[in-house]
């Protein structure tokens, strides 16, 4: 992962594409694999709620909401921390420094994320196409452009995560990612 590679891994919702969020070359490679423009924000998957803490500015209400819903099929848009703005590559954070965070309710995904650290979490699909449904389809779609395919049960449900904007009272537009 530290060499800018992209991996395909299961989550509770869809198959995802992961890359090291701190490496600009990994984000460029991810955009290339998906066939999408560079710079579109991408959420980050974590192994636990505690792992999110250094990367997002969490209020007490944010923590309470996250404790109830994570791990789970949600992506929360939060205010990024100075550490995230300093260490993560352009293209991870959205407008105004928003950070999309996930903790998948999938034991294999969380074990993988424990081993690798936070990874990008974007659906495994070519830009504008539906997400892949299974590992064989992922291999056919991405081939050697993806460095590794992580096989772990159970299979993803096939429904995208629900995006919850914790900045809903802000006037900036929200980009769904």
Give residue ranges: language-model regions.
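Active-site-adjacent structural elements in enzyme catalytic cores
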Residues: 1-177
């Amino acid at each position: 992962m530290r060499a800018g590679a992209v991996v395909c891994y299961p989550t509770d919702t869809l198959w995802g594409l992961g890359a090291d969020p701190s490496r600009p070359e990994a984000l460029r490679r991810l955009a290339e694999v998906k066939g999408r423009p560079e710079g579109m924000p991408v959420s980050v998957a974590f192994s636990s709620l505690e792992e999110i803490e250094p990367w997002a500015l969490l209020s007490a209400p944010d923590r309470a909401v996250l404790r109830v819903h994570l791990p789970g099929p949600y992506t929360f848009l939060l205010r990024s921390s100075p550490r995230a703005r300093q260490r993560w590559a352009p293209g991870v954070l959205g407008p105004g420094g928003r950070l999309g965070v996930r903790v998948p309710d999938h034991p294999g995904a969380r074990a993988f994320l424990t081993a690798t650290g936070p990874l990008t979490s974007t659906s495994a699909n070519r830009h504008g196409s539906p997400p892949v449904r299974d590992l064989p389809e992922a291999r056919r779609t991405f081939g050697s452009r993806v460095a590794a395919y992580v096989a772990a049960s159970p299979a993803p449900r096939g429904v995208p995560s629900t995006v919850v904007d914790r900045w809903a009272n802000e006037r900036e537009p929200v980009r769904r990612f």
